[in-house]
């Protein structure tokens, strides 16, 4: 499957979620309304692009004539390297699905993120580990979070004060990342809830 743009991924996710919730795909008008397109024609162009990339099929003559070709996997999605500026759960970032009970983590894990680097080694998060992440923006100071600064994603301990966020490493060889909320784009992707190493929950 060819990589999707961020906007195409939004359209794909909307269709998938709509089918999951209602049992049928959305109309072009519904896609346009939900995603803020000016007209159903704009939605149609995105559908054609998705069809060219092989993730869906357009069935002519039906307002809901959309069939997804990417089979839904079971298990927790495993996210590998994240390209700058793209959604964390974009289809092209998912390396596969891990068969693990999400309920073994508290709160439950929504996805696994492959750790890159040793900046959190002092608390047992090592390069190559799979970090279990609960997707939320409701986090507190002192918690280990998956954060996005501008276009980059990182795992660090959160310390927020006023308009400044410090993302603290757990390795003395690394320096804290300081974010000025007045000048930089910052968001929380989720809360770290556990680690899997070599197939075993730690």
Curated annotation (Swiss-Prot):
Molecular function terms, GO-annotated: DNA binding; serine-type endopeptidase activity
Residues of the site described as Cleavage: 84-85
Superkingdom, taxonomy of origin: Bacteria
Active site: 119, 156
Short name of one Pfam family: LexA_DNA_bind
Alphabetized InterPro entries for the sequence: LexA, LexA-like, LexA/Signal_pep-like_sf, LexA_DNA-bd_dom, LexA_repressor, Peptidase_S24_LexA, Peptidase_S24_S26A/B/C, WH-like_DNA-bd_sf
Record carries keyword Membrane: no
Function: Represses a number of genes involved in the response to DNA damage (SOS response), including recA and lexA. Binds to the 16 bp palindromic sequence 5'-CTGTATATATATACAG-3'. In the presence of single-stranded DNA, RecA interacts with LexA causing an autocatalytic cleavage which disrupts the DNA-binding part of LexA, leading to derepression of the SOS regulon and eventually DNA repair.
NCBIfam families tied to this protein: lexA
Protein name as annotated: LexA repressor
Biological source species: Enterobacter sp. (strain 638)
């Amino acid at each position: 499957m060819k990589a999707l743009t961020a906007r195409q991924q939004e359209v794909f996710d909307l269709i998938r979620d709509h089918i999951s919730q209602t049992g049928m795909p959305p109309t072009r008008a519904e896609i346009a309304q939900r995603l803020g397109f000016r007209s159903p024609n704009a939605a149609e162009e995105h559908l054609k692009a998705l069809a060219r990339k092989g993730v869906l099929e357009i069935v002519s003559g039906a307002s809901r004539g959309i069939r997804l070709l990417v089979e839904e996997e079971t298990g927790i999605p495993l996210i590998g390297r994240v390209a700058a500026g793209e959604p964390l759960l974009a289809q092209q970032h998912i390396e596969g699905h891990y068969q693990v009970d999400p309920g073994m983590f508290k709160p439950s894990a929504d996805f696994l993120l492959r750790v890159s680097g040793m900046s959190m080694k002092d608390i047992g998060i090592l390069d190559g580990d799979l970090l279990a992440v609960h997707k939320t923006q409701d986090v507190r100071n002192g918690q280990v979070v998956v954060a996005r600064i501008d276009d980059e994603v990182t795992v660090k301990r959160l310390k927020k004060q006023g308009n400044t966020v410090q993302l603290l490493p757990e390795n003395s060889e690394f320096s804290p990342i300081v974010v000025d909320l007045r000048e930089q784009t910052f968001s929380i992707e989720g809360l770290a809830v556990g680690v899997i190493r070599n197939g075993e929950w730690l």
